[in-house]
């Protein structure tokens, strides 16, 4: 094992159940060669209707099971590939993350942490982020890897709101251990990797940090991958009635005004990254694929049979690269100590459109070093975003998430009663029961 091969897919599910067989056919298309990845991460947005997503639990099981089945089917197509274990699945509202490890490598996961934050209405999870951090052992090293699934504010004119959402994610997404019984062991394992004294809290104001260690998005010894529908567009305003005539079409001629590279110049995320206003410290591989959003209903209807000779876009939205995957490069102190170490991008591309969504999935294949990121030197204190993050952790992060979760349950119950067939059936049964009881009571009184 010369590298930790990591494969990430982000997909906006449009609140529909994915077709496992179709998803499986293309899930691993971005692998540079038919070799099973060591870590497989799925970042899912709008994973289910709001009622099921906010209530969570068993209501989401049918949606997650389809992705588990898709991974199982896709893995069988890899020569000498093993089956995968879903080591963790978490959601915050409508945004979810799933992590898979080959069965024969599952014992390499030494600890797991998860965290999440809502950035939607009243900090609820109609928009937000959910993440995991794992300790992956290789020989005598423990490699820390964090992956975050995110869904930011929509619309062409929502640029500032998207940047604000990112700020709130950095301030509010805090990782805590999954298994409380393993907390003490995990804390000891990580102590040698963290630039923190035994008595110094990892976060200000957190309770007994030896038994409940916590960490923010940026951590000195951890890799970080961000994947999701970040919703950055190619215009600040909606298109005019004639703009669609120059929407991208399949062509290799870069001088053609309809070649996607011309629209890519207007990409908001690229300009905001350069200006240092969002996704601080993260980088992205070169984009060599068409916009991933928004495809028309007509294009979706023929998604599984289309020959790709044309792209049919929704005319009321500028085609945009909403779905993105970014990563944090190795810190300078690691490059200095271990010059050959590097993060290698094997492939970054979009996957075929599917009939259940107006977004195309996006996949990234990365090879990470099998040596852990060392504890930074004192001289590196301000040289990396891992040590000097753009925003501080909100000391009220736990209370805010708990309050938002209570609101999600209320909204989920109301949506369940009004928007789902189960809820409407329940209301009808209650009405029929109440009416029947009223008539029985009136009959008794009449006699």
Segments from the language model and where they lie:
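PP2C/PPM-type serine/threonine phosphatase catalytic core
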Residues: 99-101, 107-174, 226
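Core residues of folded domains in eukaryotic genome-function proteins
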Residues: 4-9, 36-40, 94-96, 126-132, ...
């Amino acid at each position: 094992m010369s590298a930790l091969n990591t494969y990430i897919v982000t997909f906006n599910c449009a609140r529909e159940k994915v077709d496992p067989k179709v998803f499986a056919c293309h899930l691993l298309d971005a692998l540079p060669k038919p070799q099973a990845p060591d870590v497989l991460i799925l970042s899912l947005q709008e994973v289910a209707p709001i009622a099921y997503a906010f209530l969570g639990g068993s209501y989401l099981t049918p949606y997650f099971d389809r992705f588990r089945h898709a991974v199982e089917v896709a893995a069988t197509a890899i020569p000498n590939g093993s089956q995968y274990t879903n080591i963790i699945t978490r959601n915050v509202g409508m945004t979810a993350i799933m992590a898979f490890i080959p069965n024969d490598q599952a014992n390499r996961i030494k600890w797991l942490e998860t965290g999440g934050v809502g950035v939607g209405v009243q900090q609820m999870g109609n928009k937000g982020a959910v993440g995991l951090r794992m300790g992956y052992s290789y020989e005598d090293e423990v490699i820390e890897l964090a992956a975050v699934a995110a869904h930011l504010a929509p619309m062409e004119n929502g640029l500032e709101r998207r940047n604000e959402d990112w700020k709130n994610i950095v301030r509010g997404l805090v990782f805590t251990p999954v298994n409380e019984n393993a907390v003490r062991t995990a804390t000891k394992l990580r102590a040698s990797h963290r630039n923190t004294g035994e008595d110094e809290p990892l976060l200000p104001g957190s309770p007994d940090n030896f038994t409940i260690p916590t960490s923010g998005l940026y951590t000195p010894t951890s890799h970080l991958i961000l994947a999701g529908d970040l919703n950055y567009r190619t215009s600040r305003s909606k298109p005019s009635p004639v703009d669609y005539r120059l929407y991208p079409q399949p062509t290799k001629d870069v001088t053609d005004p309809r070649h996607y590279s011309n629209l890519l110049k207007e990409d908001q995320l690229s300009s905001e990254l350069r200006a240092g206003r969002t996704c601080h410290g993260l980088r992205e591989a070169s984009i060599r694929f068409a916009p991933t959003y928004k495809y028309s209903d007509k294009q979706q209807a023929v998604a599984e049979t289309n020959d790709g000779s044309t792209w049919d876009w929704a005319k009321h939205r500028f085609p945009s690269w909403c779905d993105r995957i970014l990563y944090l490069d190795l810190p300078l102190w690691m490059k200095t100590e271990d010059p050959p170490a590097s993060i290698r991008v094997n492939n970054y591309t979009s996957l075929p459109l599917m009939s259940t969504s107006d977004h195309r999935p996006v996949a990234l294949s990365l090879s990470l070093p099998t040596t852990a990121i060392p504890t930074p030197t004192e001289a590196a204190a301000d040289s990396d975003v891992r040590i000097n993050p753009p925003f501080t952790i909100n000391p009220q992060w736990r209370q805010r998430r708990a309050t938002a979760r209570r609101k999600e349950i209320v909204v989920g119950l109301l949506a369940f009663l009004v928007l789902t067939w189960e809820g409407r059936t329940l209301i009808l049964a209650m009405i029929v029961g109440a009416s029947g009881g009223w008539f029985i009571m009136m009959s008794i009184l009449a006699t």
